Amino acid sequence: MASAELDYTIEIPDQPCWSQKNSPSPGGKEAETRQPVVILLGWGGCKDKNLAKYSAIYHKRGCIVIRYTAPWHMVFFSESLGIPSLRVLAQKLLELLFDYEIEKEPLLFHVFSNGGVMLYRYVLELLQTRRFCRLRVVGTIFDSAPGDSNLVGALRALAAILERRAAMLRLLLLVAFALVVVLFHVLLAPITALFHTHFYDRLQDAGSRWPELYLYSRADEVVLARDIERMVEARLARRVLARSVDFVSSAHVSHLRDYPTYYTSLCVDFMRNCVRC
């Protein structure tokens, strides 16, 4: 079972989403409300207690919620080296749906920063395989993502993760990461492209057609607003129902903290619209 090998959290409401009922219809019959199973993919270095605040948005409304954050060393180093180790984690994550027998329920992804996007890109690829092609995704929310090759922003994010490490170790890891990025994605970019497609390019060309909501801020110093706006334009060009909301002043993955009511309403309205589609 994938659940034995993945450090995840699942919240199941007392009344599961597929068993909830609306008030009786005019004909006297109750109509079934199928809330989606929500999968939260955390940012690099994210703690489960951080994701729990977002999880509450959906759990309070009767959704089953799965929370997972990929290990930071895979996010920053494996992907930068072109090693698709996150694909294995993405497969285990999707296997959870079968373990809990919820694979027939609609799915909503809520993806945070590039750390979540790097994992999500493999989810998209796996959804094209025989094992997972019957899973029904109804929508995806992107929070502070995706960003395209912002080395300074990535170093800021990694520095925040390593904040409590020894100063010398922190410096060595930051230098190592910068060298890997420059070597594989600048100097050797044409060679790297032969065996590994950057996650940003993969998302731009993704064949998925469900609605997408991009929540970002021009004040974000980790993922640049222009990268997200360019992604939205690319998705619209592929006839995907993509919408974006600029929070203007909030920092990276801080939109819920700064605008809790507005952020929550955006997520809930998007979820409900996706389920009705």
UniProtKB/Swiss-Prot annotation:
Keyword Transmembrane: yes
Keywords annotated in UniProt: Developmental protein, Dwarfism, Membrane, Nucleus, Transmembrane, Transmembrane helix
Coiled-coil annotated spans: none
Membrane topology of this protein: Single-pass membrane protein
Subcellular location: Nucleus outer membrane
Domain of life from the UniProt record: Eukaryota
Any one GO CC term of the record: nuclear outer membrane
Residues that span the membrane, as ranges: 171-191
Gene Ontology terms: biological process: negative regulation of BMP signaling pathway; negative regulation of ossification; negative regulation of osteoblast differentiation; regulation of nucleocytoplasmic transport
Main location: nucleus
Entry annotated with the keyword Coiled coil: no
InterPro entries to which the protein is assigned, alphabetical: AB_hydrolase_fold, DUF829_TMEM53
Function comment: Ensures normal bone formation, through the negative regulation of bone morphogenetic protein (BMP) signaling in osteoblast lineage cells by blocking cytoplasm-nucleus translocation of phosphorylated SMAD1/5/9 proteins.
Sequence similarity: Belongs to the TMEM53 family.
Record: disease: Craniotubular dysplasia, Ikegawa type: An autosomal recessive, sclerosing bone disorder characterized by proportional or short-limbed short stature in association with macrocephaly, dolichocephaly, or prominent forehead. Radiography shows hyperostosis of the calvaria and skull base, with metadiaphyseal undermodeling of the long tubular bones and mild shortening and diaphyseal broadening of the short tubular bones. Affected individuals experience progressive vision loss in the first decade of life due to optic nerve compression, and deafness may develop in the second decade of life.
PANTHER family per record: TRANSMEMBRANE PROTEIN 53
Protein name (database record): Transmembrane protein 53
Gene behind the chain: TMEM53
